[in-house]
Structures are given as C-alpha cells and as structure tokens.
Amino acid sequence: MMQDLRLILIVVGAIAIIALLLHGLWTSRKERSAVFRDRPVKRLKQERQDQDEPPLSERDEGVGEVRVTRVRHDDDAPLSRLASRVGEGERDDASDPLLADGFGQPVSNAPRAHREPPQIRSAEPAMPAREQVASDSDDMGGGDDDDPLLPAASRAAAPQTDYRSSAPAADAPAPAAESSVKAAQVPEKETVLVLHVAAHNGTVLSGEELLQSVLQAGFQFGEMNIFHRHLNPSGSGPVLFSLANMVKPGSFNPEDMADFTTPGISMFMMVPSYGDAHQNFKLMLQSAQRIADDCGGVVLDDERRMMTPQKLDGYKARIRQVLEANAGV
C-alpha cells in the first residue's frame, strides 16, 4: 500500500514539474513575441514625439521636468537589444533638439528609457531645462566615459593623458648601455701582459750594462731587432716573452750598445703562451727585477706605476680569466 502511494506521488510530482516547465516556456515565448511586436510601434511613436517637440529656444520658461520611465525587457534577447540601442542612438543624435542646440549629451541612449512629452505646469516654478537634463542623466547613471555609443566629438572633448610622451626619451640610451655591459662581460681569449724597467728620475740606463744584464737573464737577440726569452736559455724552443726599448721604434743595435742609453725597457708576454702562463709570468717578473737591480732601475707595471702586491694579483687574475675563457671553448 505504501509503495503504491509513493509511486503515485512520484508520478504526480513529475507531471507537475513538466507542466511548470511547459508553462514557463510558453510564457517566455509570449513575452518575447510581444516585445518584438511592440518595438516598431514604440519607435514610430518616439520619432513623432521628437518631431513634434519645439526647439529649446522656443519653449517657455515654465517647462516642467523631463521624466524618464524605465521599461524592463526580457534578458533573453541581447543581440536584438544591441541592434535597437545602436539604431536609437543614431536617431537621437540626428533629431534631438537638445543636441542640435549644443546643450550636452542625449538624455538617454539606452533602449530601456522611454521619454514622455513635457508637461506644462503653471502653478509650480520650473527648473531650467539644462539643469533638468543634467540631473536626469545623473539619475540614470549613464556616464559619458562608459557609454561606447556616444558621438565621437563628445568623447574627444574629454581630457586625455598621453603616457608615452616621456618614456622613449628616457629609454633612448638603454641599447648603447646594454651593449657596453655585454661587451664588458665577454671574457677575453687572449691578452698581453707588460712590465717596465725604468731608470730613476733624471737618469738613464747604460747600454753596456743593460746588454750584459739582458744576456745573463737568458735573452737572445732576434726578430724585429729586439731580445727574446726562449724556453731554453740557449735560444731554442718557443718564445716565452720579449724585451724591447721603451723609446720608439723600440729596437736595439747590439753593436752600438756601448754608446746607447735609454730611459727604460719594456717586457711583454702573450697569454695564452707555451707551457704554464703563470710560471712564464713569474719568470718574466724575476728577469725584470734582476735587470732593474743590475742597471739601477725600478720595476713598473703596465701603467708605469710602482709595482704593488695588488697589481700582481691583478695580473694573475687576468691570466686566470683568459685561461678559463679558452678552456670553455
């Protein structure tokens, strides 16, 4: 018995739900057809009312406020509402006397607003028409900046800020700065290390003493008329570093060294070089110090300043960077 009653209730409930759905669909279609059927009539009535309205300059000062009546439409027809809105916006721009006289924007561009003809009230003081139009527009919440259907001239009147005016000028030097930074970050794959042996201020190095000290340090006279330090002191093997005159053109004449004087000499080596670059630089530094002691000079760095421990660390760092750059190839 209870199962039969439950089955009956389920059937009755299903029938009721189906009936409600059918009734809702029928009501929705009926309202939609009514909206589409009444819209041409409303448009024609609106055009006639706009044509019958006298210009604002011909109206009396006692014109009452313009009232706006909101008409709620069905939300199931967004495309039709958009088409209607565009059509009504174009007609309002062409026929509204308020726009023709230059008093501002249309009172309403939305399809939900229906404007009734003004009513003349003799007993009550009337507000100016311009203030009424502005107040009605504010009540409807339709800002000029938010409505895409407003005329282009009215949107152009609003102040606009160009945020692109100063940015290119400030960013113009950026490519050059970035290129210089990238160039500085690229490690060198070869470099030249230079040491100088210079005479004390106001003195010069004697050619005869210089030649004797250079030969004792293991240098051999060779190409480009300068001295070279080979792997073997006898002059065989690859060149490790070289010695030239500090004065241009930098060459020597071994046969004329007795009458030769110079303010100093320069020693240089290429990195990478044959063998261990660190050991080759150490040997070049020892040779420079020996020549300076023999000839009464001082050892200077590549900027012709006194050699310091910090500068020696800089030389070693340059050697290490070049070797690492070549090892990564």
Swiss-Prot record:
InterPro entries given in the database record: Cell_div_ZipA (IPR011919), ZipA_FtsZ-bd_C (IPR007449), ZipA_FtsZ-bd_C_sf (IPR036765)
GO BP annotations listed: division septum assembly; FtsZ-dependent cytokinesis
Major subcellular location class: membrane
Subcellular location: Cell inner membrane
Residues annotated as transmembrane: 7-27
Protein's membrane topology: Single-pass type I membrane protein
Membrane-side (Periplasmic) residue stretches: 1-6
SUPFAM superfamilies from the UniProt entry: Cell-division protein ZipA, C-terminal domain (SSF64383)
Top-level taxonomic group: Bacteria
Pfam families membership: ZipA_C
Positions with biased composition (Acidic residues): 136-148
Region annotated Disordered, chain positions: 45-183
Record topological domains on the Cytoplasmic side: 28-329
Gene Ontology CC: one annotated term: plasma membrane
Biased composition regions of type Basic and acidic residues, renumbered to the chain: 45-78
Coiled-coil region list: none
Keywords of the record: Cell cycle, Cell division, Cell inner membrane, Cell membrane, Membrane, Transmembrane, Transmembrane helix
Record's compositionally biased regions (Low complexity): 149-180
HAMAP family named in the record: ZipA
Family indicated by similarity: Belongs to the ZipA family.
Quaternary structure annotation from Swiss-Prot or TrEMBL: Interacts with FtsZ via their C-terminal domains.
Role noted for this protein: Essential cell division protein that stabilizes the FtsZ protofilaments by cross-linking them and that serves as a cytoplasmic membrane anchor for the Z ring. Also required for the recruitment to the septal ring of downstream cell division proteins.
Protein name in UniProt: Cell division protein ZipA
Protein source organism: Sodalis glossinidius (strain morsitans)
